């Protein structure tokens, strides 16, 4: 049987990474989240290149299963945080567009005479 240590180390590293990404998201460090998401994807690609033996003992399978479940659960939480952030940004964009529209409307009438303004 091939040595499973490299695979186990990669999965443990992936779990640590996604937990760090979650912590960054919870702290509003969105630029860092985006940067680390790239590292996360690269880690997944690295894992996919590791040869997995056909006959893995059931105790080791259980360990991998638990790691995978933790990774997937945390990733799901990160996706939810990202979705919430996207909704917040959508609201901010809409508010910005509304403000721009209001400013443009006021600018159209800026040359008009306002009540109480002395006329030439």
Curated annotation (Swiss-Prot):
Key word Cell membrane present: no
UniProt keyword annotations, A-Z: Bacterial flagellum biogenesis, Chaperone, Cytoplasm, Repressor, Transcription, Transcription regulation
The UniProt record lists the keyword Chaperone: yes
InterPro entries to which the protein is assigned, alphabetical: FliT (IPR008622)
Region span, Required for homodimerization: 1-50
Compartment(s) of residence: Cytoplasm, Cytosol
GO BP annotations listed: bacterial-type flagellum organization; negative regulation of bacterial-type flagellum assembly; protein folding
Primary location class: cytoplasm
Coiled-coil zones: none
GO-annotated cellular components: cytosol
Region of interest (FliD binding), ranges: 60-98
Short name of one Pfam family: FliT
Domain of life: Bacteria
Family: Belongs to the FliT family.
Function of the molecule: Dual-function protein that regulates the transcription of class 2 flagellar operons and that also acts as an export chaperone for the filament-capping protein FliD. As a transcriptional regulator, acts as an anti-FlhDC factor; it directly binds FlhC, thus inhibiting the binding of the FlhC/FlhD complex to class 2 promoters, resulting in decreased expression of class 2 flagellar operons. As a chaperone, effects FliD transition to the membrane by preventing its premature polymerization, and by directing it to the export apparatus.
Subunit structure of this chain's protein: Homodimer. Interacts with FliD and FlhC.
Name used for this protein in its record: Flagellar protein FliT
Annotated organism of origin: Dickeya chrysanthemi (Pectobacterium chrysanthemi)
Source taxonomy: Bacteria, Pseudomonadati, Pseudomonadota, Gammaproteobacteria, Enterobacterales
């Amino acid at each position: 049987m091939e040595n499973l240590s490299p695979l186990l180390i990669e999965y443990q590293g992936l779990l640590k990474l996604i937990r760090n990404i979650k912590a960054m998201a919870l702290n509003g460090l969105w630029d860092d989240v985006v940067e680390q998401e790239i590292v996360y994807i690269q880690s997944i690609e690295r894992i996919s290149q590791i040869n997995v033996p056909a006959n893995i003992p059931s105790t080791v399978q259980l360990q991998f299963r638990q790691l995978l479940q933790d990774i997937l659960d945390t990733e799901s939480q990160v996706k939810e945080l990202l979705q919430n952030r996207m909704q917040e940004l959508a609201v901010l964009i809409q508010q910005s567009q509304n403000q721009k529209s209001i400013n443009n409307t006021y600018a159209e009438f800026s040359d008009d005479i306002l009540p109480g303004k002395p006329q030439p």
